[in-house]
Amino acid sequence: SYGGMVGLAFAALFPGRIDRLAIISAAAEPHAAGTAVRELQRRIVSLGLRNNAANEALSIARGLAMLTYRTSEELARRFAPGIGLEDPLSPSEAGEYLRARGEAFRAVMSPERFLSLSASIDRHRVDAQSIACPALLIGANSDQLVPPAQMQALDASLGGPTSLHLRDCLYGHDMFLKEAKAMGELLQPFLAEGAQ
């Protein structure tokens, strides 16, 4: 994800300082759909800053982000659909989860820092052909932010040998957080090769 973008940028800028590159759920540039969602998030946070509601706006923006990190299938398995009859603002089960994630996020992230981080993702551009070191690429077939086609395009455009692994996963973009064992099984042999 973000670390993958940093790794790609580092490999492109400093080719002599890197021997191997492991990229999880990242591409040479942002996907248009992800950029659109992040732009909405930045507008929400900006509106909050202008109206003395920055923390609530940041929480809402994070909730929106969570919908892009996870799959609709996972949410349908975990939460009941719909809201109560009494109040149009009554939360759904999924909404309560998103609210909790937003509250946790705003405890560790300032609105200004979020705006800078979000914009940096949408400014990310790397000339993948300039990266010649061996690269391991790992992605999820269900990822909405870095769809499989983007991982395949990165695989095809990197200038060195690559190994692409696209996994079926319920967790979408958050695969790397939720499937640590599977990530380790792919990363360990690749990293061990480099240590020899």
Regions found by a protein language model. Name each.
Residues 152-155, 161-196:
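Catalytic active-site module of serine/aspartate enzymes centered on a nucleophile-bearing elbow/loop
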